[in-house]
């Protein structure tokens, strides 16, 4: 499953790269990211793939190139969610690699200290130029952003219909949401989506789902399942500003498939221990 997430992320990254190759002249005019319809979906796929790439980087340092590629393509999508959550996930993934390699930690600390200031300086110099097309009055996030309106509307819908919400098929929010034909009304926020469209029933259902998944990850905890946990966390993050986990295909399906794989992992207490090691369990890919 980690290979699937990894391959999907690389494929998405190459799709984004191909888009810029085909529109290179327009990009070179001011070096600002260009709009394309599937940028938020691309950001979602790249974000959940970062932990998978980090898992392989923990075993083979050549995969750090993929981690860098996925993060750079996240920036090139022009998604503000990709920028904010992608940077957070990159740091978590690097911390994961650090944790998985006790014998290399001294080396990683030296590299981190040497590269920290140049990396931050590069990001500060690069982001305003790349995201110039997304700026409103010099701010990356405007107080008038429609996501604020969606979130408030979700709370209002919950107050009006606290038990079941307004329903997934309700179109009464159409004036503030211009979705594609056949789509439900998205609130672009996980909390607002559950409260506004499903009410307390949705809170109980999704609350139990979250509890069950976290409990499963804890019971099966290992370096492999930690990578799955990071991918799940990435999906939860992107769901705070995009449809994310509420899209049945492929987002929700990927999460279901991922937890099927996690469920087939051995329980922590049952993981065999390597000969000559009293505390380090053997880590398997599947």
Where are these regions (language model features)?
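Hydrophobic transmembrane alpha-helices and their immediate junctions
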Residues: 62, 99, 198-236
